[in-house]
């Protein structure tokens, strides 16, 4: 049986070799018939700490790696614009004299 694969957005990368991935799905409401977004968070193994917050990733089901971690990051589909931090140059003007 093939392993399940899901696509989601990284919402946390604070842990070592682990990311939290938010996966959204549409579910039809039983009574009203309207499609409603449902989200679920998965802990996924990121061996090289390559993922950053906001990245769109593909995760795959795996054997249990820890108490909560059962998924592995397979692919980074889209990099976040937030993860690309441009260098900011600051210039400070210091005037030697004082005004009277």
Swiss-Prot record:
CDD domains: Ribosomal_uS17. Keywords: Ribonucleoprotein, Ribosomal protein, RNA-binding, rRNA-binding. It comes from Fervidobacterium nodosum (strain ATCC 35602 / DSM 5306 / Rt17-B1). Pfam families: Ribosomal_S17. The keyword rRNA-binding applies. It comes from the Bacteria. This is Small ribosomal subunit protein uS17. Belongs to the universal ribosomal protein uS17 family. GO terms for cellular component: cytosolic small ribosomal subunit. GO terms for biological process: translation. One of the primary rRNA binding proteins, it binds specifically to the 5'-end of 16S ribosomal RNA. GO terms for molecular function: rRNA binding; structural constituent of ribosome. InterPro entries: NA-bd_OB-fold, Ribosomal_uS17, Ribosomal_uS17_bact/chlr, Ribosomal_uS17_CS. Part of the 30S ribosomal subunit. Coiled coil: none annotated. The keyword Ubl conjugation does not apply.
């Amino acid at each position: 049986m093939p392993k399940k694969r899901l696509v989601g957005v990284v919402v946390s990368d604070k842990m070592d070799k682990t990311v939290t991935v938010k996966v959204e799905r549409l579910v039809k409401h039983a009574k009203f018939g309207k499609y409603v977004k449902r989200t679920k968070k998965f802990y996924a193994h990121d061996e090289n700490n390559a993922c950053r917050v906001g990245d769109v990733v593909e995760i795959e089901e795996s054997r249990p790696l820890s108490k909560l971690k059962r998924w592995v990051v397979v692919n980074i589909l889209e990099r976040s614009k937030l993860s690309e931090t441009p260098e900011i140059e600051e210039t400070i003007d210091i005037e030697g004299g004082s005004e009277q």
